[in-house]
Amino acid sequence: IKPYDRNVATKIIEDFMLIANETVAQDYFWQELPFVYRTHDNPDTEKIKKLGTFINNFGYTIHIGQDEIHPKELQKLLMKIDGTPEEALIGRLTLRSMKQAKYTTVSTGHFGLATNYYCHFTSPIRRYPDLQIHRIIKDNLRGRMNQKRIEHYDSILPEVAKHSSEMERRADEAERETDKLKKVEYMEERIGQVFEGVISGVQEWGFYVELPNTVEGLVHVTSLTDDFYHYEESSYEMIGERTNKHYKLGQKVKVIVA
């Protein structure tokens, strides 16, 4: 198991798609026609602070001003980690700290892409919102966008956006569960083996460790038998009461698969 590698060709294609999606969204926003936008709200401040604590252990920092962060800060972070051993891990945790994007009929901007206008236009063969947008564009280009047609789209698009967002979340969850199942099957053959990983999350009940092969598992607090550990919420770490031993975000540890 290894992280997916985005090569130069992939990045070029992604850039073309982003530009096309942004251009179409901006054009139809200013035409003031009914439309389906792809929006992404600002991240939760607490999650961003947690991300900042995590990356500090790798020597990186992000500037958080007045309880909010500018998307350029995260873009700079991703540029700094490009090609480094910790790129995949920090990239995934950065993504987890974001809110989930959704489909809406009002353009409120896209935080992750740092743009005011965005939509999904480039893949009508596999995403319904893209197909809906192509129908709107077709009506508009052929001169059929009269008042009756506008009222039609005004009546159906809110439900289209809501349903598409719900179905996307279901599909994402199914994909995550499938990935988890395959990772469990893979690690089942490696029970008893020792791996080195990085602490990717800390909670009252223990901490999570992510291995270089992207598999993540829980080290429950009851398995830490050398001391009684308590959770320090302010610094996201487990601290031993007698030994003062620390387990914190970003720390490298060795684990036994059980």
Annotate each predicted stretch with a short phrase.
Residues 202, 255-257:
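A generic structural signal for residues embedded in beta-strands
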Residues 1-211, 218-220, 225, 229-233:
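Append "with occasional cross-activation on large, charged helical scaffolds in nucleic-acid assemblies
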